[in-house]
Amino acid sequence: TGTPRKKSGIPKKTGNPEDTAESTGAQEAKHKAGVDARIVRFLKKHHVLTLATSGEGAPYCSNAFYCYDAERNLLIFTSDMATRHAQQMARNPCVAASVVLETKVVGRVEGLQLCGKAARADEAARRAYLRRFPYAALAELTLWAIAPDFMKFTDNTLGFGKKLIWNNR
């Protein structure tokens, strides 16, 4: 929210409460793209995202099963070209998405919001998706991949409202 961030994805210390939670784990090994390992673990643990697209003068949301390719920092999902969101992505690849842990326990709240570009997925993405969802091999798939350029992970296990920011804009 207007807080300056380094291109590497490691936030600057500004004293802003929205800044990332600093802890002994904050210096843990980073993913190739500089994504904090806690974000990678969260994305790998879950499998449903809410996708936001825009077109025809209005935003639109849909849900999809996804797999996370940590090596390439891609969220891969399937969507038929006849769907409203696929048609919108084909015209405007700028998307947003969220992944949440549904819980009533405030101290366990976790959720990720991201922005990025969506494009048709390649063969490597297809293999990754089928490893996660083998039954999908029975269907004709139109796969998409989101390459995030910004992620904000809220993790109340680090303290109420603590956030980790990854920014590659």
Could you describe each region identified by the protein language model?
Residues 84-112, 116:
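Helix-adjacent hinge/juxtasegments
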Residues 45-47, 60-62, 112, 137-140:
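Short, basic and Ser/Thr-rich N-terminal targeting/leader segments
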Residues 43-44, 90, 130:
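Alpha-helix boundary recognition
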Residues 28-31, 106-169:
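Charged, gly/pro-rich active-site loop segments
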Residues 46-81, 89, 95-100:
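Short beta-strand segments
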Residues 1-6, 12-13, 17-48:
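Extreme N-terminal tail/first-helix region
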Residues 79-83, 96-101, 123-135:
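Short acidic (Asp/Glu) patches
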